[in-house]
UniProtKB/Swiss-Prot annotation:
NAD(+) binds at residues 72-77, 106-110, 130-131, 143, 152, 170-173. Its cofactor is Co(2+); Zn(2+); NAD(+). It is found in: Cytoplasm. Zn(2+) binds at E185, H248, H264. InterPro entries: Dehydroquinate_synthase, DHQ_synth_AroB, DHQ_synth_fam, DHQS/DOIS_N, DHQS_C. Belongs to the sugar phosphate cyclases superfamily. Dehydroquinate synthase family. Keywords: Amino-acid biosynthesis, Aromatic amino acid biosynthesis, Cobalt, Cytoplasm, Lyase, Metal-binding, NAD, Nucleotide-binding, Zinc. This is 3-dehydroquinate synthase. Its EC number is 4.2.3.4. GO terms for biological process: amino acid biosynthetic process; aromatic amino acid family biosynthetic process; chorismate biosynthetic process. Pfam families: DHQ_synthase, DHQS_C.
Length: 359
């Protein structure tokens, strides 16, 4: 098991990464939060895979549990769904010291975090991420949010968990499409934070696709450490944390304009290709960087170009993004793997030009 610590203005928590950690949840939980009951928020599929075993494990350690099973999908990450959860917490007498355990992927983590942040002005939150994307990205850093009015993550806050337990054994049951989506965030982290990790992904693609436990624990730990290091420098996304949005400016617009039928990982993959091409157009990086990035993305079964888009609608969606500042769309561009930069004064014509080029 590997442990990564985050220290945020005196608040500390750990990200634990290893095999079969769900079977150790109670002991790990008690070390962080003394408790005798918890609320577990999950979805139908994850509950079927892990819910019964986790509930039995918690009970064997003297921890009672209420499991709330939600529908699957990004469309349910909403204020309506949060409003569905609050009465159940009230009816079961969940208190301010009753931890909420988010058992699932990014949607469950974001929604559970939002509920934990707002119920009784904040209750303890523990992430049990079961998807690759949530293990390397969404469970780390304290961003909690729901979608509203067709806009991705427009209602939310920063609310740090008390503990993250990433059981890489859960990746065995992850569908190929979801595994690829998680790889998009790993590629993103390598592109902005580590040329060495980028090379490692290029070199070890077959073993990673085979989900070798040793390699997965290593690259998940490296990716989590990259994000943790950035978050510790800029918890509330006012400066350097912006670089974690590489690929996300276009990515979120693609998700929103598709009514969230476009997966997050696929949208980010396309967004990274767009941002790297824009970087070349602006003379910031060599075309070789684009070729390496697009090949790596394609090698993991992710798209490199958008399908059936209207550039004007995409730009309008970008203007609703929370990364907009003073009316200017903020892009994270790339000089080379490991060297990102933040840019705001990008001409609309250049954005449209690259979108047309990629159609």
């Amino acid at each position: 098991m590997k442990s990564i610590g985050l220290n945020l203005s005196g608040r500390e928590y750990k990200i634990l990464i290893g095999s079969d950690l769900l079977a150790e949840t109670a002991d790990l939980l008690k070390q962080a939060i003394p408790c005798d009951r918890v609320v577990v928020i999950t979805n139908i599929d994850i509950n079927r895979l892990y819910g019964k075993k986790l509930k039995k494990h918690l009970e064997s350690k003297g921890i009672g549990s209420l499991f709330l099973e939600l529908p699957e999908g990004e469309i349910h990450k909403s204020l309506d769904m949060a409003s569905h959860i609050y009465p159940q917490l009230i009816n079961h007498f969940a208190e301010r010291n009753t931890p909420i355990l988010a058992l699932g992927g990014g949607v469950i983590g974001d929604l559970s975090g939002f509920v934990a942040a707002t119920y009784q002005r904040g209750v303890p939150l523990v992430h049990l991420p079961t998807s690759l994307l949530s293990q390397v990205d969404s469970s780390i850093g304290g961003k909690v949010a729901v979608n509203h009015g067709g806009i991705k993550n427009i209602v939310g806050s920063f609310y740090q968990p008390r503990l993250v337990i990433s059981d890489i054994s859960c990746l065995k049951t992850l569908p190929e499409k979801e595994f690829a989506c998680g790889m998009a965030e790993i590629i993103k982290s390598a592109a902005i934070g580590s040329s060495e990790l980028f090379k490692q992904l290029e070199t070890n693609t077959p073993a990673i696709k085979d989900r070798s436990p040793e390699i997965m624990e290593d690259i998940i730990s490296q990716t989590a450490a990259i994000k943790a290091g950035i978050v510790c420098q800029d918890e509330t996304d006012r400066g350097i944390r912006n670089i974690l949005n590489f690929g996300h400016t276009l990515g979120h617009a693609l998700e929103s304009t598709s009514s969230f039928s476009q997966s997050h990982g696929a949208a980010v993959a396309i967004g990274m290709c767009f941002a790297s091409r824009l970087s070349v157009k602006l003379g910031l990086c060599e075309n070789e960087t684009v070729l390496r990035l697009e090949k790596l993305i394609a090698d993991f079964g992710l798209p490199t170009r958008p399908q059936d888009i209207d550039p004007e609608k995409i730009i309008d969606a970008m203007h609703h993004d929370k990364k907009v500042s003073d009316g200017r769309i903020r892009f994270i561009l790339l000089k080379r793997p490991g060297e990102p930069l933040i840019a705001e004064n990008i001409l609309r014509a250049d954005v449209i030009s690259i979108l047309e080029e990629m159609k």
